[in-house]
Amino acid sequence: EKQVSVTEFDVIVIGAGVAGLTAGTRLAKEGLKVALVTTGESTVCLSTGCIDVCSRDENPLLGVAGLPLGHPFREVPGELIREALTDFQARMAEMDLSYAGDPEKNRRILSAIGAFKTTCLTPSTMEASAQNEDEKIHIVTFAGLKDFYPSYITARLKNASFSTYDAGAATTMGIAARFEDEAFLEAFILWMEQLCIHEDKIAVPAVLGLESADEIIRKIEYRLERPVFEIPTIPPSMPGRRLFNALKDQYRRKGGVIYWGWPVIGVEKSGKQIEAVMAESQGRPTSLNARAFILATGSFVGGGLTARRETITENVFDLPVFV
């Protein structure tokens, strides 16, 4: 029989996405002993790094208020959503990852295939994104990069053109790492200056650095004297990874504990009261006890839900799922 170790916390958060890390940080900041349990890589890394609220209305708060009765988002007051978004922007600014946007006004960003995505808050590196098909933009792509399609964009945007730079790397992560080197950035800017770009804006796939994208984009804009913006690539995306790293680092700074790569394999109850979750690492089970539990496992991609032919199942507590 396996030996089970027991660890006590005030709150256990299950899931390491935006919701889980934000909740954990807020609680740890209040002085509670918080643990976050996750199976591994967060699906935030697959995202654009943008924060969507409700894309059906130009004003996302009005969009939420207009959702059908019974929709869970209708239960959240607009003032609370506004406060949460403002708090998120302040916390990300603390981590040198500034976000642009207004809780009461949706915006559009250009995607890797030339379509427009409606969102609420964007990394500031996307703030200057084209807003319609008529804008004059020059796209700079990178030799061998498979997660970005400039020809799709120029097919949809009649005033767009593109050039290709050989970064000596062909993955989003590899190119982003190169941009952290000042000599590489200087060579890239010199090459761009020689292009004599005449369009109003410059677009680049979202590879402008691992952690220093804000600073890198400011340097390029200063030298080329026009707005520069990142376009999210096909997942995995650097803006999503930057967001995840900022949230995770902030959570740890506030004193939060992370059980990384620890799938929850069971739940311990006393009647209807949950007292602990059983998590496993390298075949060794650990009972993680807490006074409260927050479920933030997401939906299908993150493993929070499983879809079968007739049913959808919640995988940790077997909670009812309403479809």
Pin down the residues of each PLM region.
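N-terminal Rossmann-like FAD-binding beta1-loop-alpha1 element of flavoenzymes
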Residues: 9-36
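Dinucleotide-binding Rossmann-like beta1-alpha1 core, especially the glycine-rich loop
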Residues: 52-145, 152-161
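Helix-loop-beta segment of a Rossmann-like dinucleotide-binding subdomain
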Residues: 73, 125-145, 164-166, 170-175, ...
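Flavin (primarily FAD) binding-site architecture
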Residues: 295-311
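Conserved N-terminal glycine-rich FAD pyrophosphate-binding loop of Rossmann-like flavoproteins
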Residues: 37-69, 169-182
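Short hydrophobic core segments
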Residues: 11-14, 37, 264, 287-298
